[in-house]
Amino acid sequence: KIIRDYPASDQLECNQDNDNFEVLRRADILVSDFSGIIFDFSLVYDKPVIYADTEFDNSPYDAWWLDTPYWTFTALPRIGQKLTMDNLDSLREMIDECIQDPKYAKGRQEAREETWEYKGEGTKRAVEYLLDKYETLTQVTEEK
């Protein structure tokens, strides 16, 4: 229905490529089903999302028995809006609101702070770990 009602144009693209980082970089907003791409787009590119109202079966996951909701489901309403059959006709207004309302920018900032530990230190920490591991392994080899 969305693709039919909103055909591709110079301003709108329905991209289904496997390598999607270039289109994500160019986009102002993402309308998506439930997927990890939502967080790539929103947290890496600092842009809002509209996500589909989907049922999530957590029974295959290790934490299926937890009574608290997964972080993902508490973060989604802070970074964008849920698209349902009831509000589908308001999609244009939802897009405008997600782009313009500062609460979504604030929500993205909060989500980044909650997920990115040691921001800017990833390479340094990985190299330090690998060097430490190498040193440990070479010491064991030398002792034999």
PLM region descriptions:
Residues I3-P7, G36-T115:
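Catalytic binding pocket for nucleotide-activated donors in carbohydrate/polymer assembly enzymes
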Residues K1-F39, V44:
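Donor nucleotide-activated moiety binding/catalytic core segment of transferases
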Residues K119-K144:
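C-terminal alpha-helical cap of glycosyltransferases
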Residues R26-I29, E97, D132:
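Residues within well-ordered alpha-helical secondary structure of globular protein domains
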